Amino acid sequence: MDTAALSPSPSPASGAEHARVLTLACTNRKGIVHAVTGALLGVEADITESQQYDSPDTGDFFMRVEFVTPATREDIDQALAPVREEFGMRMGLWDAAQRMRTLVMCSKDGHTLNDLLFQQRAGTLPIEIPVVVSNHLDLQPLASFYGVPFIHVPVSKDPSSRDSKEAAEARLRDLIAQFDIELVVLARYMQILSDELCRDLAGMAINIHHSFLPSFKGARPYHQAHERGVKLIGATAHYVTADLDEGPIIAQSVQPVTHAQTAADFVARGRDVEGSTLAQAVRWHAQHRVLADGRRTVVFS
């Protein structure tokens, strides 16, 4: 998501061409694109991709620019500062080659975790997964197969237990800090996060819901869909918020089904959709293609 100030990223040696990603959002008015591209021209930037959107609902303007330049990060920041001030922009600047450090949380169902770990290894997702966290031990062998550390953080329903939800979330916060995490992915993690943790992770936590939201929220959505005789099932990747399954949607996919298929068939087909949908959302987020527009998102896919 875009940030109020330019986000930190390493500065390359002066003179070396380096790829950067710039995102911005502000109230729409004339002259924004001209001002931004002019500032980039001042640091010898060669723009390789540029996308923009003017929201008719909020009146905000959104822009994402990829460019290469020999300028240092400090030079770019200095060139953009007057533009940011003039238009009151929320702006982010990143190293395009830097992989996003991602903590994956899971429970017992490993298909989405496996997809993320495989794509990380294959180089098709611009993320680095330094740790997998789970409230169960079932998926430890899967993480070990990919050489990724697995940390068991059990969650007890007893608030007085050493494994209480409060204690588990405190442990999660420690791990986020320890591993310098930029993104948290709930890959079928079957625990509801506290409102406080959801607020703290706003814009940096993605969940996959095994339903085409806003239909069939909560548990066993495929069985709900089967009972209603739907002809399409799907999956929704969204940002985590305190309102369960109500966060801004990043990506959705659907799969056709028929009356002849059982609820178990729905589940099997749905798993494939979940994996691809979550991976797409993670990819877009890690490439800084997702910006908040009220309760919605702008996705420069």
Please name every model-derived segment.
Residues 29-49, 80:
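Short amphipathic alpha-helix segments
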Residues 3-14:
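Intrinsically disordered, low-complexity terminal tails and inter-domain linkers enriched
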Residues 24-35, 70-71, 106:
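Short, surface-exposed ligand-recognition loops at beta-strand->loop->(often short) alpha-helix junctions
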Residues 15-19, 36-37, 42, 86-89, ...:
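FNR-like FAD-binding dehydrogenase module
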Residues 13-27:
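Short glycine-/aliphatic-rich beta-strand segments at the starts of folded cytosolic domains
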